[in-house]
């Protein structure tokens, strides 16, 4: 609980400051930093420590190139040399991963199939998911639209926590997560939908643009 409160007091305002008020390149830098940290966390979870130290830098570098590629594909960079160059640089970095796999074959810290999958997951799949925030930020009224996944996630998580604490009696999946309850799950679902309805109202007051209420509820 203390950790959640600390994140809410310190982390959330800092996150909102970067996403909503800083230039869109700051969002790119934030996502790059998250991908670098996430690369290490993922590899550390599935690989031995020696292989994690050996390969996480490669995964982190690939993730940075993927994020940069998405950023420079934006309309402000249309027709610029960097927009044409980034896909080739990203592809070259991906090729480097497979070259390393071949060169290190048979050695103690070789890149086996598990390591390759972890590197590609950390270097490609996760960055592609996180760059959805970047794509939202680069749209018109992106400073507001980028909050959609955050509002849905935070409201759902918060209501699931407090709903479970107040009303939770029936275990949801005790073998997977002993503290989760069905009442908490329902509270989270309701909280996410309610949060998105409130977001729709505030977004209209700020931009005079009406988001489709059905989509807002579905996203919640």
Language model: regions and residue ranges:
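Membrane-embedded alpha-helical bundles of polytopic integral membrane proteins
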Residues: 1-217
